[in-house]
Amino acid sequence: MLAKTLLALFAATAVAANPVAHDDRAVSIEDRADIEGRALCAGNLIDGPRKLSIGGTLRVYYSSAGGGTNCAYVTNDLGKEVFMYISLQDTSSSAFRLDDDYGDFSQFAGAVKLDGMAKHCFQVLVGIDGKTWMSRKDWHCGGGKVA
């Protein structure tokens, strides 16, 4: 009987501590988008969550894999489906390199990724519902953070 009581107590504690694993209704739209987005971006979070004035939250990751991989996505903080755009552009290369994602999204746009970025800088452009935000061109050079 004691073992059964302890097991029930442990299960109730685990559910309360981790509602995502047991009850999808307990997860906010932004948290759900963040969980899904993180599954797409490997590596370490090097910037973010950065709240953008245009209604989104940007996250940027860096991994040493693939000669240095940068990955980014932006969550939709507006609570409705809107046109979203995100691009990641290598600004250190003479060859134009860009990855982008766009469409009508209710949760997030991205993930966008560029490999071979270990000694390169990049720029991020985000568009949400007709408004835009752009980083500096010399942002996150070589996987490090530039404020």
Predicted region positions:
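Post-signal peptide N-terminal regions of Sec-secreted extracellular proteins
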Residues: 21-147
